[in-house]
Amino acid sequence: MSSRTVIRGGLVITASDEIHADVLIEDGRVAALAATGTPAAEAFTAENVIDASGKYVIPGGVDGHTHMEMPFGGTYAADTFETGTRAAAWGGTTTIVDFAIQSVGHSLREGLDAWHAKAEGNCAIDYGFHMIVSDVNQETLKEMDLLVEEGVTSFKQFMAYPGVFYSDDGQILRAMQRAAENGGLIMMHAENGIAIDVLVEQALARGETDPRFHGEVRKALLEAEATHRAIRLAQVAGAPLYVVHVSATEAVAELTRARDEGLPVFGETCPQYLFLSTDNLAEPDFEGAKYVCSTPLRPKEHQAALWRGLRTNDLQVVSTDHCPFCFSGQKELGRGDFSRIPNGMPGVENRMDLLHQAVVEGHIGRRRWIEIACATPARMFGLYPKKGTIAPGADADIVVYDPHAEQVISAETHHMNVDYSAYEGRRITGRVETVLSRGEPVVTEREYTGRKGHGAYTPRATCQYLT
């Protein structure tokens, strides 16, 4: 039986257009759009009518970087796929791409199967997977080809975390060469982990144990050096490169230079680098531990380069790197030794709102908001135009957004499974009102109407900027 919904009277915003239009949804997909008040729009009929007058109608957010239930430092990220995808929906995100992990000594397939088992039947919204490659060998390289064919088309490597996820330059080059052949996209955590480990050891020997030292040892220059090295290795391999969680002015400069040379190099940043700084890491009484993530928060002056990069398209995507650990019992593992603080912050629920606040404050325009949060990540990870836009044939992943509502971000009211908010007390303008995932209401006028198991695994095509 056909199910139809009409969203009437809103300002439809995509990466390329803004138009006052009515949206007809049929069987989980966008069937048609027509300018509000025209005979074509008036002819839309449906059982369900959503009044979006005075509101924005935007594509559901695509968060290309989350870590649900991720093991790290002897504990696990606090959000499960159930709680994390529910929180994402509350924040206007309707698709996540999470990271399945290959453990050293194991196959990619084992890691991917484990993540499918965590997610299947538990997600409120649609999801896909990237693959973390921790152990490059001949078998792993063959498996990369198979995964691309199955719709896992991006592979993350780490220049950081020796002994855990770290790959050396030779392993990175081999994986990049394979990606150049099979169409995959290499995603890079670009920090010089070998040098950082020396600085960590030296800092602890001096008695520098507080959370703020996490930011001091993970130097911007070591992010820039690794970014430069990753770009040149990718150039040698003839492969595209996507650098995750870019935080430093010097790293943006490396990306800008590479793109000016015409290289297929892309960069992502995250809200924490745009809105927070080392001032947070330096908060007293171990409060700074809440803000320990890698790459680390930088001094405030780095924010201008990140905003500029987003405006000039030297940075193309804003994701969250959502990897929450509770302050109580998890972040506290690092009391007396900052290197033992689990690395990661909550944010999957806040991204769309914080980026709307960036529109309010004049950092970016409305269409750029949708571009960096919805359309570009969908294209980058082979999901467009099924995801990331509002157009006939697209999945009806749609958010009715109130641009005038005011809210105060707080752990008291958020839905992430973590005991603090990185943005506690921040007053912002704009709020999600209603969320549809494939036409099904997940949030209805600020009431949760979704269910675990609605979210479907979504295989991906290869990066659409390279075809």
Swiss-Prot record:
Domain of life: Bacteria
Binding site for Zn(2+) 2: 156, 189, 245
EC number: 3.5.2.-
Keyword check for RNA-binding: no
Residue(s) carrying N6-carboxylysine: 156
Matching InterPro entries: Amidohydro-rel (IPR006680), Hydantoinase/dihydroPyrase (IPR011778), Metal-dep_hydrolase_composite (IPR011059), Metal_Hydrolase (IPR032466), Metallo-dep_Hydrolases_sf (IPR050378)
Cystine crosslinks: none
Transmembrane regions: none
Keywords (A to Z) from UniProt: Hydrolase, Metal-binding, Zinc
Pfam families per UniProt: Amidohydro_1 (PF01979)
Cofactor-binding details, from the entry: Binds 2 Zn(2+) ions per subunit.
Xref: Gene3D superfamilies: Metal-dependent hydrolases, Urease, subunit C, domain 1
Entries under CDD domains matching the protein: D-HYD
SUPFAM superfamilies referenced in this protein's UniProt entry, alphabetically: Composite domain of metallo-dependent hydrolases, Metallo-dependent hydrolases
Binding residue positions for substrate: 161, 294, 343
One GO CC term, this protein: cytosol
Family in the record: Belongs to the metallo-dependent hydrolases superfamily. Hydantoinase/dihydropyrimidinase family.
Subunit note: Homotetramer.
NCBIfam families noted in UniProt: D-hydantoinase (TIGR02033)
Name of the molecule in the record: D-hydantoinase
Organism, scientific name: Streptomyces coelicolor (strain ATCC BAA-471 / A3(2) / M145)
Gene: hyuA
